[in-house]
UniProtKB/Swiss-Prot annotation:
This is DNA-directed RNA polymerase 7 kDa subunit. Belongs to the poxviridae DNA-directed RNA polymerase 7 kDa subunit family. Keywords: DNA-directed RNA polymerase, Early protein, Nucleotidyltransferase, Transcription, Transferase, Virion. The lineage of its organism: Viruses, Varidnaviria, Bamfordvirae, Nucleocytoviricota, Pokkesviricetes. It comes from Yaba-like disease virus. GO terms for biological process: DNA-templated transcription. Part of the DNA-dependent RNA polymerase which catalyzes the transcription of viral DNA into RNA using the four ribonucleoside triphosphates as substrates. Responsible for the transcription of early, intermediate and late genes. DNA-dependent RNA polymerase associates with the early transcription factor (ETF) thereby allowing the early genes transcription. Late transcription, and probably also intermediate transcription, require newly synthesized RNA polymerase.
Length: 63
């Protein structure tokens, strides 16, 4: 699942580009070829969340 990403400057939905970056693992350069607005390009380049590590660590008993 990819969370929705909206460009705060122009209002364009750039979730599909985020999907290609995170799920399809395309390079940022390849994805940005299809994005024309500079504001959207900047948002994609700087605000993509890295994959989260969802493994649970056991609690350490300090007593």
């Amino acid at each position: 699942m990819v969370f929705q990403l909206i460009c705060s400057t122009c209002g364009r939905d750039i979730s599909e580009e985020r999907y290609y970056l995170l799920i399809k693992e395309l390079s940022l350069k390849k994805v940005l070829e299809g994005v024309k607005n500079n504001c959207c390009r900047l948002k994609l380049s700087t605000q993509i969340e890295p994959q989260r590590n969802l493994t649970v660590q056991p609690l350490i008993d300090i007593n």
